[in-house]
């Protein structure tokens, strides 16, 4: 273009030709004013060399989209809008949804699972950006079950190979506390119930951290625990006016839903505070209960590190005492058994020896006295001559020998039986009494140490309160359930066949059964 041409707006002579798509234009380089436009249509000669081209081929991409995919993308953006997420979150969630939509694992799924996939993409985006949100919130938006949502969430994370960080507990507490109406400047809230958000949130975070360190958060949903911690923290800031307010009324005034497990979490938190209050000297003298312990929540949170260490030290001491008592009880059982065996052996031997010595001496003394008395009586009756004759023949010697042999043997046997029986009975009674007394002491020590005092120990919920699993009994009525007419398959019969003769008889029986229908 000639340089003599000037721009009518600015007077500049810098005029250039600009090809705007298929239209040639003359434009001022300084102000951008269009001096003349090219031809909008082509000539007949140019059109003769052209051919029809599809839009997808001309642009290089296919803008056509299935209805289900478009509906899913719209649903993702709507959920992000409901949660008031930043604009960048929705783009990231849409990209995750498109990746999941292309994966063959999620092609033929139900409508419910498609909704859950949408929610999972939004939830993953929030987790990656440290946006405090819970799985229960997303489940309520997509009307999904938590168990199914959790399974699909894990599946998407594995399939797409995404890195999902854990939820920050502090951010989650702060986010949940913002939803309480009592912590906002509202005219509808009574003055003695209103509280500043920062003050309550700070104490709630400390209470939740204490619950985490005492195993109350393990395996639990966070919202019920945060609700209970917020309620206790709110009460402790003005206990005189707020102790009479119940948890349900607190949630109603705060305009939030009351999760069903919140009451259980509240009792667990109160029990933990009572356990820790034992180790503070100025609280140990007080008889605290679940309501009055809330008044001292600030002191317990301020010294919680010391209190937890003290509780663990006392627990270790209790367990060590229990181990020593167990060892002493086992040793006492073994020692008593050995002592009793030795006493029974030694006592019987000593008793027999003493009895044999004492019985012989007593028997000889009695016989000598009785024989002399009889002899004097016989002599007094005039039988002295006969006695002298018998004595001369040696009868008296034989009689004494027989008496000494027979009478001593019988007397010794009877005395040994009776005395030994009495002695063993007395020893057994005394030894058993002592053994039972010692065993009872050891058993009491064991029972007190196998289950340590709940005041000094913090355990996970699954250990402190285990669920009672129902055990099915195979035959509840015993032998009445077995009639002998139960069905049994051929494979089960073959398991019980042992000898070749039994196998042959079984084959013959099968052949007879096959021949009967043909006959």
UniProtKB/Swiss-Prot annotation:
Source species: Xenopus tropicalis (Western clawed frog)
Any one Gene Ontology cellular component term annotated for this protein: nucleus
Source taxonomy: Eukaryota, Metazoa, Chordata, Craniata, Vertebrata
Highest taxon above the source species: Eukaryota
Entry comment on modification after translation: In response to oxidative stress, a Cys-residue is reversibly oxidized to cysteine sulfenic acid. This impairs formation of a ternary complex with TBP and DNA and down-regulates expression of target genes in response to oxidative stress.
Chain positions recorded as Zn(2+) binding sites: 7, 10, 28, 31
ZnF start-end (TFIIB-type): 3-36
Sequence repeat copies, ranges: 173-249
Entry protein name: Transcription factor IIIB 50 kDa subunit
Residues annotated with Cysteine sulfenic acid (-SOH) modification: 462
Stretches for region Disordered: 465-487
One of the record's GO molecular function terms: TBP-class protein binding
Family of the protein in this entry: Belongs to the TFIIB family.
Chief subcellular location: nucleus
Gene name, Swiss-Prot/TrEMBL: brf2
Subcellular location per the Swiss-Prot or TrEMBL entry: Nucleus
Function field: General activator of RNA polymerase III transcription. Factor exclusively required for RNA polymerase III transcription of genes with promoter elements upstream of the initiation sites. Contributes to the regulation of gene expression; functions as activator in the absence of oxidative stress. Down-regulates expression of target genes in response to oxidative stress. Overexpression protects cells against apoptosis in response to oxidative stress.
One Pfam family cited in the UniProt record for this chain: BRF2-like_C_cyclin_rpt
Keywords, comma-separated and alphabetical: Activator, Metal-binding, Nucleus, Oxidation, Repeat, Transcription, Transcription regulation, Zinc, Zinc-finger
Any Gene Ontology biological process: regulation of transcription by RNA polymerase III
Subunit note: Component of TFIIIB complexes. Interacts with TBP and forms a ternary complex with TBp and target DNA sequences.
């Amino acid at each position: 273009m000639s340089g003599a041409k000037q721009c009518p707006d600015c007077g500049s002579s810098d005029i250039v030709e600009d090809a705007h798509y298929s239209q040639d234009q003359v434009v001022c380089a300084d102000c951008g004013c269009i001096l003349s436009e090219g031809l909008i249509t082509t000539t007949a000669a140019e059109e003769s060399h052209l051919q029809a081209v599809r839009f997808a081929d001309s642009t290089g991409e296919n803008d056509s989209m299935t209805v289900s995919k478009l509906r899913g993308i719209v649903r993702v953006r709507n959920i992000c809008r409901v949660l008031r997420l930043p604009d960048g979150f929705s783009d990231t969630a849409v990209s995750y949804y498109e990746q999941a939509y292309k994966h063959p694992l999620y092609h033929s799924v139900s409508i419910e699972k498609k909704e859950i996939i949408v929610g999972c993409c939004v939830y993953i985006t929030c987790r990656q950006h440290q946006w405090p949100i819970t799985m229960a919130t997303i489940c309520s938006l997509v009307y999904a079950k938590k168990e199914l949502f959790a399974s699909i969430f894990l599946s998407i994370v594995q399939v797409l190979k995404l890195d999902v960080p854990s939820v920050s507990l502090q951010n989650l507490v702060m986010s949940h506390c913002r939803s309480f109406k009592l912590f906002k400047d509202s005219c509808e809230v009574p003055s003695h119930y209103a509280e500043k958000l920062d003050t309550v949130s700070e104490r709630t975070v400390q209470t939740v951290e204490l619950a985490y360190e005492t195993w109350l958060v393990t395996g639990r949903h966070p919202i019920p625990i945060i609700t209970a911690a917020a309620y206790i923290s709110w009460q402790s800031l003005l206990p005189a006016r707020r102790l009479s307010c119940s948890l349900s009324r607190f949630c109603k005034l705060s305009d939030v839903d009351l999760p069903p497990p919140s009451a259980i979490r509240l009792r667990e938190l109160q029990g933990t505070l009572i356990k820790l209050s034992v180790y503070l000297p100025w609280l140990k003298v007080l008889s605290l209960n679940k309501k009055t312990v809330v008044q001292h929540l600030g002191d317990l949170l301020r010294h919680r590190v010391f209190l937890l260490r003290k509780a663990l030290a006392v627990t270790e001491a209790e367990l060590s005492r229990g181990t020593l008592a167990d060892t002493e009880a086992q040793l006492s059982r073994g020692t008593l058994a050995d002592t009793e065996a030795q006493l029974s052996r030694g006592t019987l031997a000593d008793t027999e020896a003493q009895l044999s010595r004492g019985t012989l001496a007593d028997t000889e003394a009695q016989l000598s006295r009785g024989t002399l008395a009889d002899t004097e009586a016989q002599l007094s009756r005039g039988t002295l001559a006969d006695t002298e004759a018998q004595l001369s023949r040696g009868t008296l010697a034989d009689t004494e020998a027989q008496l000494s042999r027979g009478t001593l043997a019988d007397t010794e046997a009877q005395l040994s039986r009776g005395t030994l029986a009495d002695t063993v009975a007395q020893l057994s009674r005394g030894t058993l009494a002592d053994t039972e007394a010692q065993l009872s002491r050891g058993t009491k020590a064991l029972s007190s140490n196998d289950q340590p005092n709940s005041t000094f120990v913090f355990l996970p919920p699954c250990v402190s309160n285990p669920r009672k699993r129902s055990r099915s009994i195979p035959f509840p009525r015993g032998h009445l359930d077995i009639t002998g007419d139960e069905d049994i398959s051929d494979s089960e019969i073959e398991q019980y066949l042992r000898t070749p003769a039994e196998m042959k008889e079984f084959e013959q029986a099968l052949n007879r059964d096959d021949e009967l229908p043909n006959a």
